């Protein structure tokens, strides 16, 4: 059994990750919050035996084998490196870090320490996206030529705060949502992005210059072009993910979500058909793969390197939106 420590008393851990760890044979034995009061309450609420107030205490605990980092973005590097130095496996929330240099440092450190580093990109675990990837690989739409991602949602009040108010913490829709688009596109297309263009704005929710909406496009190395629309501000929009090829189209609806829902339609000269989907919990799929990787079998659903690619794409979108010019996507890996 893999024993986990949590860095951060986060909503995502409470709503999704703690349950996924337990459902896949792991145990959550400790959690860390800089607030002793909050940490104790969180631990009690979630059935966690220990609560500590420092990263050093958590990663130094011999009862902890792996660490889940879900603090604000600017803290990811130092906390992940501390865990790696202590010989712990790490599943880190996206984005891995605030800069590519820091993200690469995390990947190299994990490799040299011989521990597993994963990025918590949940969407590549969705049955819809896996079915689309398989259909493309099987040639069911011919050669992919374009993709479209609709990921404009409404950020609920309990998730607002720093995402809308703190640029220094990595707030804003690009590093929160666009990085997920980037990873899902890479996964489904089995292709790497090369260049991005974008326009961003604040429609009233973002403060301190934080963008709450962005539209843009990405050109992939194969020549596929993809467009995306991401936002925190749209209460009634539907999410979607489409890939269009020379011989057909894949149309995913309600698939850019944490829940195991949505549909995928294959449309071609023969008509329309629904792809069969297994509605498995996305986070349980991710944690099962992570536990297997710890045991020496395979790798996480999204590796540290995958996290570098999504961050590189997100930062290119930030640059393109700021300059009005196309920005190259380079990881330095």
UniProtKB/Swiss-Prot annotation:
Belongs to the Gfo/Idh/MocA family. GO terms for molecular function: 1,5-anhydro-D-fructose reductase (1,5-anhydro-D-mannitol-forming) activity; nucleotide binding. The keyword Oxidoreductase applies. This is 1,5-anhydro-D-fructose reductase. The keyword NADP applies. Changing residue 13 to G: Can use NAD as cosubstrate as well as NADP. It comes from Ensifer adhaerens (Sinorhizobium morelense). It comes from the Bacteria. It is an enzyme of class 1 (oxidoreductase). Optimum pH is 6.5 at 30 degrees Celsius. It catalyses: 1,5-anhydro-D-mannitol + NADP(+) = 1,5-anhydro-D-fructose + NADPH + H(+). Monomer. Keywords: NADP, Oxidoreductase. The lineage of its organism: Bacteria, Pseudomonadati, Pseudomonadota, Alphaproteobacteria, Hyphomicrobiales. It holds the Pfam family GFO_IDH_MocA_C3. Its EC number is 1.1.1.292.
């Amino acid at each position: 059994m893999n024993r986990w420590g949590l860095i951060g008393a986060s909503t995502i851990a409470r709503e999704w990750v703690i349950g996924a760890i337990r459902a896949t044979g792991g145990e959550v034995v400790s959690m860390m919050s800089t607030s002793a009061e909050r940490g104790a309450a969180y631990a009690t609420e979630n059935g966690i035996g220990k609560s500590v107030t420092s990263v050093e205490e958590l990663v130094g605990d011999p009862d902890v084998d792996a660490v889940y980092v879900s603090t604000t973005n600017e803290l990811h590097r130092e906390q992940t490196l501390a865990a790696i130095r202590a010989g712990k496996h790490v599943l880190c929330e996206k984005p891995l870090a605030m800069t590519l240099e820091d993200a690469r440092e995390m990947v190299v450190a994990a490799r040299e320490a011989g521990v597993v580093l994963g990025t918590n990109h949940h969407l590549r675990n969705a049955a819809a996206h896996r079915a689309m990837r398989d259909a493309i690989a099987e040639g069911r739409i011919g050669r992919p030529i374009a993709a479209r991602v609709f990921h404009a949602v409404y950020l609920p009040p309990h998730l607002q705060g720093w995402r809308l108010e703190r640029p220094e913490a990595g707030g804003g829709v690009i590093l929160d949502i666009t990085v997920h688009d980037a990873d899902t596109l890479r996964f489904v297309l089995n292709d790497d992005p090369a260049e991005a263009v974008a326009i961003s704005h604040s429609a009233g929710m973002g403060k301190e210059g934080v963008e709450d909406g962005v539209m843009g496009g990405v050109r992939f190395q194969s020549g596929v072009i993809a467009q995306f629309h991401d936002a925190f501000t749209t209460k009634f929009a539907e999410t979607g993910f489409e890939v269009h090829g020379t011989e057909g189209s894949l149309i995913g609806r309600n698939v850019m979500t944490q829940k195991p829902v949505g549909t995928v339609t294959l449309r071609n000269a023969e008509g329309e058909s629904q792809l069969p989907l297994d509605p498995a919990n996305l986070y349980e799929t991710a944690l099962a793969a992570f536990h297997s990787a710890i045991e020496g079998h395979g790798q996480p659903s999204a590796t540290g390197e995958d996290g570098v690619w999504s961050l590189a794409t997100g930062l290119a979108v930030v640059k393109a939106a700021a300059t009005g010019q196309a920005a190259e996507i380079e990881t330095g890996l």
